[in-house]
Structure formats: C-alpha cells, structure tokens
C-alpha cells in the first residue's frame, strides 16, 4: 500500500489515549487501525497539578505501542494532540519531551477552544441529521460544548470537568449513593451555568454526544432493546440502577462493559447536569469527534451539506450499483409514500431511511445474484456508513434483507431505529417499488394509485394492465401472498 495515502491522528486524552490510522481513497476515508488504551492520565494529577511519575510511565508505555505503527506513515500526515490534563500539568513539558522522542514527531498541546472546534469538525463530517447542532464531548478532565451550523461553529466552550476528575472528586469513596450523585450534578451545573445562556441563544435542532459516556449509554440501550435516543428519563433510570448497586466495584448494568464501568457514574452525573441545565430533549451518538476532526483537517475535505448522500454515493461507486435503477426505485417509493403519508403518518427521518434503502438495495448483486438480499444486508451491517447511527444501519440492513421473498417479521421487530409498525410500513413500500420498477425503464412503470386504511393497502393499476402483463400479474400475486402471510392485507385492482 502506498504510504502517502495513510494518515494518523493521536489524541492524548485525560482518560484514554487513542490512535486512528486511515487511508484516503477517492475523497472518502477508510479506517485501517483504531487503538485505544485506558491510561487515566488525569488520575495522576495531584492538588498542585503535578503529574505523577506512574501516570507518565503509563502514558509513555502506551505511546511505545503507537510508535511502531507510525513508522510507515510520512510525518506531515501525522497529528498528535494533547488535551486537558497536559494543559493543566505543571510538569507537562517533561512528559511531552519524552513522548516526542518515543513517537518521533511533534506533540501539540491544544487549547480547550481548539479541542472543541476539532470535535465539532469530526462530528460535522460523520454525523447525519439537521445542520444546526449542539455537540457534547465529556472527556476525562474537560467537557466540550459546541454549537454550529454545517461546518461553521457558532459558540465553543471547554469546561473544567470530566469523568476522571469528577470520579476522584465526588466518588472517591467508590460509593454510589444519592448524595454523591447530587453533589456531582450540582457541581457540574455550577460549571455549566455561566455558558448556558450563550449556548441556548445559538440554539440547535439536533444534539449529538461524542464521548465514552455517550458510547457506553448507546451500548446499554442497544443491549436492552431500547431505541437509541438518549433522554433525561433514561439517564435518571440508569442513575437509580447505579444507586441500587451501591458500590462502584459492584456496578452491573446490562450492556455496560467492565472497562467503561469505572468512569460511568461520574460521566452520567455530568450528562444529567447538561441535559437539565440546557433543557436537552434527546441526544444521539456522533459518528466521530476529535480524531476524525484531525484527519479531515489534514485532508482538507469540505463538510458535505448532506453526509448521508456522500456515503450513499461512495458505496454505490464501490459496489458498481446501477444508479439509474436505484433512483427509479427511490422515486417510486417516494411517490407511494406521498400517497399513504396521511394515513400512516411517516416521519421525515423514516422517509429518508426508506430512500436510502432504495439507493442501496442492489449492492448484494456485487457478490452474487443468488441470495442478493442477504448479501446486501450483510454489507450494510458491516460497512462504515458516516451519517447513519448504529440503529439506522440495522434498520437499513433489515429492510434490504426483506426486499423480496417471504418476509422475516421478527427481524423488522428487532431493529430499534423506528417503531416495529413503521418498519413494516417502510418494508411494504420498498418491496412494491422494487417490484414495479423491475423492468428498469421509466416508460414501463405503470401509473399506480395506492391507498391505505390502517394496515390495509389498496393498489389500483390502469384498467387492462394486468391482462397485458402476465409475468407482472404473477409477480404481484406472489407478493400479495407473501404480504398476507404476515397479515399485511394487499388488495390489487
């Protein structure tokens, strides 16, 4: 592999050190390596902000691992940044000098504002949804809050609180008592209060979280079969569960990994304070943050107006998809959706996911015609899809799995991006659009009227269409039968 196409970003965080190695290919980024080590640098800071020898040694040990991988990458294509703990440490110079010797490249201690800007860039490049966003990143010793529109930030704040420092300060007795949570939340709200008005003034349509705490919450919710939106009610529920566990070493929540458990209660307390102080309705996981911001910055790639569209284009190119056919199916599905939207009340995000499924429905053909829906579902489940959340990826894979042949109803019910009933409705529209666009020519798509009454669909074709299209009639009869097996009434006239 040509080493000039490789880029590396290293983030010396207060809780973990991370390394991301990517390859730039045709304007998109392919992740090659992700290495993360819990160094807990912030835990080595004493009251005088002196970093202990043990903490520094943990950091250097980790960097020796990273250094081996960096040898293959040109130095101008490597960026190493250090954040809150090394901003604070009075003896940071000693740590950084040795770190630079180990890595063989410069280490830059970045300001809180620069960290916030990079986090925003990373999220903007990799997260779909509305353009106007609030990005929250709870680190080990600092928390970044950024508002922005598209690629432009409108306000940037880096606050002195993090999951490691709050752990040492409010849960040092390892006791998960209500009082400890109350103290941690109150302190976090005190830190937030001076910046809350400005953040609210700039406003946001979507809120995304880009930290280990939010990642942990996502894993918990997926494991417990909840939808992926983080809400204050869910956070309070998890806090009560933590309090019931009593002690940090006894903390057990389904979906919470052992490595995330230590700083989970302190991160949770900070997040509850952020939700309360800023009156956040819901939050989802960002596709990327600081490291992605560094990589995209080195590549000078512009933030797309629509990240999901860029992702779909890249995948279609990679798997040699017939884009005319994909657009034909999407146009028909959208037409069907407009005809039933009053009866079925399908939300804009559900529409967008249906149209995404249309754009990708033939990627399985790049593997083999036989079992193409299975191949398509597998590919979507395992591909990196910037702009789509894990739950949305699962829904797309499920729709592609059920694009033809008998319907696997249980798979539509196991995804958690949309309610099961909505997943069923999207699946029905996708199947009909694929069926009627099957001859791959615009002039051969009949005029179709679709009406919905509850779950009953009535499909009306031009008068003599069925008589003149015996194969088409056979396919429609078969589809009608398959839909009836799962109690989806389809009346064709």
UniProtKB/Swiss-Prot annotation:
It catalyses: guanosine 3'-diphosphate 5'-triphosphate + H2O = guanosine 3',5'-bis(diphosphate) + phosphate + H(+). It comes from the Bacteria. The keyword Hydrolase applies. The keyword Nucleotide-binding does not apply. Gene3D superfamilies: 3.30.420.40, Exopolyphosphatase. Domain 2, Hypothetical protein af1432. Its EC number is 3.6.1.40. GO terms for biological process: guanosine pentaphosphate catabolic process; guanosine tetraphosphate biosynthetic process; nucleobase-containing small molecule interconversion. Keywords: Hydrolase. GO terms for molecular function: guanosine-5'-triphosphate,3'-diphosphate diphosphatase activity. InterPro entries: ATPase_NBD, GppA/Ppx_hydrolase, Guo-5TP_3DP_PyrP, Ppx_GppA_C, Ppx_GppA_N, PyroPPase_GppA_Ppx. Pathway: Purine metabolism; ppGpp biosynthesis; ppGpp from GTP: step 2/2. HAMAP family: GppA (MF_01550). Belongs to the GppA/Ppx family. GppA subfamily. PANTHER family: EXOPOLYPHOSPHATASE, RETROGRADE REGULATION PROTEIN 2. Catalyzes the conversion of pppGpp to ppGpp. Guanosine pentaphosphate (pppGpp) is a cytoplasmic signaling molecule which together with ppGpp controls the 'stringent response', an adaptive process that allows bacteria to respond to amino acid starvation, resulting in the coordinated regulation of numerous cellular activities. This is Guanosine-5'-triphosphate,3'-diphosphate pyrophosphatase. It comes from Salmonella paratyphi A (strain AKU_12601).
